[in-house]
């Protein structure tokens, strides 16, 4: 069974690149352009990893991650953002063990980071 990744990223081009890179690495990826839609899907089926941008319409990535890990405490979370400081702020409600990949990044780095998280 391939591991499933839920991707929330509001930038269409970025979302397409990420899906392509992760599928090529052997993952099954479902992607959404906002946090609210991603959360609705998460309530329907389990995922191994939530990969989310932080700044998005309707529900930001930190809120999405908070709600998602309430729903499934075993869900791993990775933020992809240009605002790494926001996710790493200890006062934020981001899950403590979430990892952060700052934009810009190479797709290879993303895949390596995802592989590491899902192997843990």
Question: Language-model segments: what does each one mean?
Answer:
Residues 9:
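Conserved acidic carboxylate
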Residues 34-37, 60-64:
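Acidic catalytic/metal-coordinating carboxylates
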């Amino acid at each position: 069974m391939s591991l499933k990744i839920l991707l929330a990223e509001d930038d269409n081009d970025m979302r397409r690149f990420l899906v392509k890179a992760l599928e090529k690495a052997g993952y099954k990826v479902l992607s959404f352009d906002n946090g609210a839609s991603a959360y609705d899907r998460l309530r329907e089926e389990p995922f191994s990893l939530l990969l989310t941008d932080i700044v998005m319409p309707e529900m930001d990535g930190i809120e999405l991650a908070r709600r998602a890990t309430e729903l499934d405490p075993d869900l791993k979370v990775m933020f992809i953002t240009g605002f790494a400081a926001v996710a790493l702020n200890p006062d934020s409600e981001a899950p403590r063990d979430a990892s952060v990949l700052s934009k810009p990044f190479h797709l290879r780095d993303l895949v390596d980071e995802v592989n590491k998280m899902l192997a843990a």
